[in-house]
Amino acid sequence: IVLMGSAIGTCEEVVDELLTRGEKVGVLKVRLYRPFSAKHLLAALPESARAVAVLDRTKEPGAQAEPLYLDVMTALAEAFNHGERETLPRVIGGRYGLSSKEFGPECVLAVFAELREAKPKPRFTVGIYDDVTNLSLPLPENTLPSNAKLEALFYGLGSDGSVSATKNNIKIIGNSTPWYAQGYFVYDSKKAGGLTVSHLRVSEHPIRSAYLISQADFVGCHQLQFIDKYQMAERLKPGGIFLINTPYSVDEVWARLPQEVQAVLNQKKARLFVINAAKIARECGLAARINTVMQMAFFHLTNILPGDSALMELQGAIAKSYSSKGQELVERNWQALALARESLFEVPLQPVNAASPNRPPVVSDAAPDFVKTVTAAMLAGLGDALPVSALPPDGTWPMGTTRWEKRNIAEAIPIWKEELCTQCNHCVAACPHSAIRAKVVSPEEMEAAPAS
């Protein structure tokens, strides 16, 4: 494979593993693209190479092919014509990573599988399911072992502190241990109030994995409402730890989980823990900021830092982060740390409870077909799995899809108080769901209006 940019680390990771299995594969890294050096390319590419895939992270509509592919192909063809190479390998070109599509180990395996074919596709895409042009390569299951010591996922709500907490975790692990730490953060344009997914890797070796975590040793659900909406337990490795922030007790929580989640936890033989982080945050005067509590729970359950060193490191990080806002806030966060360890409880796994609810549909049955197929998949966090045919060919989007996006994630219900309302109309203009609607009426019409 010939490529450049951030996908190199992923390719190297896969190639190193395949070489230990006796496979004859390699990756050639282009470090300087312009001016393109055909001489250095030919020196680096062994004569024994029989098939080459050139990957471009761009699309050139109207061109014969993508830029890097054309440069490599020209260099090889000219060398062959001039007698500088005795053989001309088969060269195919592919696209990857457009619009931030994932490029993981399974994509590299798919490219090598295509190169082994007797007649590989001369042009292909990888990391996308294209059922319109049929250029996409089928992705095999990633069977390569993970080099990470720990892989963790944190599902939070924008502004609850989950992203900041994970960034702090990376700093603590990187500064306080001999290990390497890496983080990726996925959140939508809503930011405050939207879903945030934090990906944390810890390894004894430098981390080359430039892709998101698909299967984790630890999954933290920082908002109980997410249990009904997102496939979190499904992303646990067998025997992994699943932590839920919930107001329910150890005896109550199992029956509250959807049957699908219960079945997955049993199948994976997971360890289930609960903590009432929202209650601790309220008691310590931290409002909705549960990040400190969930940080302590993560370190306590994973034992990444031994003994009380996690507590000491977190106290130091809190003092550094919040000292500018006053010692009182620092001490409130320290208090939350102490309460967090005492408030963690393990829930024994039980058979699937037939009386427990099933996962509700993401959108109402009354929704249009487009909302059921496309919007619903995106709301469930499965938008990347949508085929090309599911999306409008001209890129237009139907109007009014927000009305079906009822997330039901609030812990408290706001109540309009007539005596406090100044009728500024800001809430009417700002609310995307039109919970409160304004009407323009004449004084005469108001006289005939009902009382409410």
What are these regions (language model features)?
Residues 28-34, 93-97:
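Short beta->alpha junction loops
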Residues 35-40, 48-51, 55-66, 148-158, ...:
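Active-site cofactor/cluster-binding pocket
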Residues 310-314, 323-452:
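Ferredoxin-type iron-sulfur electron-transfer modules and their immediate structural context
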Residues 6-10, 145-147, 154-166, 408-409, ...:
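Long hydrophobic segments that form regular secondary structure
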Residues 2-23, 36-41:
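Redox- and metal-dependent alpha/beta enzyme cores, enriched for Fe-S-associated oxidoreductases
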Residues 13-27, 78, 172-178:
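Short helix-loop-beta junction
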Residues 54-135, 201-248, 256, 347-348, ...:
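Phosphate/diphosphate-binding loops
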Residues 98-169, 174-179, 191-192:
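Active-site phosphate/pyrophosphate-binding segments
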